[in-house]
Amino acid sequence: MSRRRHSDENDGGQAHKRRKTSEPLEIEDRLESLICRVGEKSTSSLESNLEGLAGVLEADLPNYKSKILRILCFVARLLPEKMSVYSTLVGLLNARNYNFGGEFVEAMIRHLKETIKLNAYSEAVYLVRFLSDLVNCHVIAAPSMVAMFESFVGVTQEEDIPQVRSDWYVYAVLSSLPWVGKELYEKKDVEMDRILSQIEAYLKQRQKLHVSILQVWSAEKPHPQEEYLDCLWAQIQKLKKDRWQERHILRPYLAFDSVLCEALQHNLPPFTPPPHTEDSVYPVPRVVFRMFDYTDAPEGPVMPGSHSVERFVIEENLHCILKSHWRERKTCAAQLLSYPEKNKIPLNYHIVEVIFGELFQLPTPPHIDVMYTTLLIELCKLQPGSLPQVLAQASEMLYTRLDTMNTICIDRFINWFSHHLSNFQFRWNWEDWADCLSQDLNKPKPQFVREVLEKCMRLSYHQRILDIVPATFSALYPASPSCVFKYGDESNSALPGYSVAVTLTNEIKNKASDKEIFNILKDIPNPNQDDDDDEGISFNPLKIEVFVQSLLNLASKSFSHAFSALAKFHDIFKALSESDEGKLHILRVAYDVWKNHPQMIAVLVDKMIRTQIVDCAAVANWIFSPELSHDFTRFYIWEILHSTIRKMNKHVQKIQKELEETKQRLAKQHKHRDSDDNDEDSGRKDGPLEEQIERLQEKVESAQSEQKNLFLVIFQRFIMILTEHLVRCETGAIDVNTAWYKNCRERLQQIFLQHHQTIQQYMVTLENLLFTAELDHHILTVFQQFCALQS
């Protein structure tokens, strides 16, 4: 009653209260907008904007200090491309309010520890770099920053830790030095020399078995593919030699030097790196992607050399822009093209190199592949007079280096290039690539052109490809995507099952029931069964052939027709695929019908897995079967296999998630029961949930067993075919390094790299059963390289 009366009597008061509570929210939103947008397009200078914003924030500190702290920590972590802008802002605030500066430093250290514990190492790097830049702004005392770096480098002395842990701490130090190296050397040169000596000693004894599995190209010319720490070390060494002078970092705090140098500084608290645990997941090592040098951009500004720190700073800033804005291509493209100091560098070349560097990054790109495609299209629209030419030059370079390019990266190049062409009327000067026509069709260049045309056909239609590509390329044209029905021609009437296929086709057209179709199929003799074998066997290849050929031919009009046919006759498919041989033969027949239409094969296999007509292991066995050997290096085959693995992984994850959610529900029930002793029903409610958990636990174990078996099948098949090749070459005194061998070995690497997080669970099994010491070193090295990624 009292609540209702209060509401009734004070309607006006309540509205007034709502306004009062909304005002702080409006002010907080305004503060967030002001901070996040500082340094963007404005009629006044950056310096005056920063000074004005510092004044606004200082005035709001009494009421909104915690909110301001939270926003500044947020931008330090998630807007690294504007780091020096925000470090200057913090410097100005510290000069006006010393206590706030101290609280901000403490908050940043807390954030850093939390970020490391959450395995968010890329964000942690930005926090370390931000702290180091605060030394330049007279917020943090240089000796305490040096002490933090010493504790970071001390991690290299820890025992029984993976190398990737030490790598990250060394990288965090080295990657901060372009910003703060000069200041630290002026104040603490002896200590800094000691830190760099420790880093040098560590880098010399690091194992680098992982490098070759991460390289885009196997050749070191024209540009070496350097390991990321080695490259950064060379850049820092050159920077030190140049007395820490660089010309590409925006340093707005220099304009406020007279104000900032009067400010009191803070000492960082002693920092102990969080210890290594079983849950720690460190960043995978990288190889620095290099595509251009100063000779490729002869006009305009000169591109910095690969070992100049300016190259690192520019690339790092462009990567930061991609990381911050990748979800919105228009904003991302605009931010890239409005890069500060863009007139001092060949910006388009840097942008294209950085984007391709991310697209080709191994094991996986930072973002989905299609993001890079749409971003490059947007950049071409914004810079139609210059960027398309740089992109064409890059495409030409990639094509000329296909022979030494990693097969995984060739796949990504095919996907990007075909998608890009589809947005520009498929315009390309194909005659420039006519050199591929004189090569063996199994070589990378003709294979690349063939797969690009295949992909372009998916994005248009067959006749369009024939119209736009010169007739001289006819050997690489995609086949006309029509089905091959072996029972459709009367000249094949002598084929076993021909008459049944004709009958079956008519009955399906007349909407026969499953029972009627079963009756027709049961009369088909089994070629695997002897006349005197009364028991018979369940697997009848001819029965499968007649049914699948006839049905897929009738449903050949479109993907939708094919899907409807699989759904309508699902029970018959299930009956025919009871055995492993049956599943395998269904896949063989589907391939025979649609061998001229790889996309149809891919979507049919996908649908058959989803509807459980075939299982994932059957698909793996089919891919490695002799019938598919002539298509083994084709793009679509690996598209199917990786799609199959992803489905299996998602299936396991889905059941694991169900199990976790059910366990959480049970835990909540227990908590509720403990707080309510009189609830007699709660004990009875536990029963069904506990039974459900038991069932889900069994399902998880079964699914994980299937998953492990799938990887065992795949790796076993790889080992078999690679071993056969190696033995054949050794016996015949033939060179091992054929185009097929390169492709096959790199496809094995691809399985490891694309599914590395899942495969990590089964490392012991793989090492004990398959990748043993007795295995040929050509194959075993791939496994060892994979292990080195997290060692």
Swiss-Prot record:
Keywords: Coiled coil, Cytoplasm, mRNA capping, mRNA processing, mRNA splicing, mRNA transport, Nonsense-mediated mRNA decay, Nucleus, RNA-binding, RNA-mediated gene silencing, Translation regulation, Transport
Gene3D superfamilies: 1.25.40.180
PANTHER family: CAP BINDING PROTEIN, NUCLEAR CAP-BINDING PROTEIN SUBUNIT 1
Residue ranges the record marks as coiled coil: 641-714
Region (Disordered): 1-24, 664-687
Major site of localization recorded for this protein: nucleus
UniProt xrefs under Pfam families: MIF4G, MIF4G_like, MIF4G_like_2
The organism's place on the tree of life at top rank: Eukaryota
Family membership noted in the UniProt record: Belongs to the NCBP1 family.
Protein name: Nuclear cap-binding protein subunit 1-A
Subcellular location, record wording: Nucleus; Cytoplasm
Entry's Gene Ontology molecular function annotations: mRNA binding; RNA cap binding
Organism of this sequence: Xenopus laevis
GO BP, sorted A to Z: 7-methylguanosine mRNA capping; mRNA export from nucleus; nuclear-transcribed mRNA catabolic process, nonsense-mediated decay; regulation of mRNA processing; regulation of translation; regulatory ncRNA-mediated gene silencing; RNA splicing
SUPFAM superfamilies, per database record: ARM repeat (SSF48371)
GO cellular component, one term: nuclear cap binding complex
Primary role: Component of the cap-binding complex (CBC), which binds cotranscriptionally to the 5'-cap of pre-mRNAs and is involved in various processes such as pre-mRNA splicing, translation regulation, nonsense-mediated mRNA decay, RNA-mediated gene silencing (RNAi) by microRNAs (miRNAs) and mRNA export. The CBC complex is involved in mRNA export from the nucleus, leading to the recruitment of the mRNA export machinery to the 5'-end of mRNA and to mRNA export in a 5' to 3' direction through the nuclear pore.
Record note on quaternary structure: Component of the nuclear cap-binding complex (CBC), a heterodimer composed of ncbp1/cbp80 and ncbp2/cbp20 that interacts with m7GpppG-capped RNA. Component of an alternative nuclear cap-binding complex (CBC) composed of ncbp1/cbp80 and ncbp3.
Limits of the MIF4G domain: 28-240
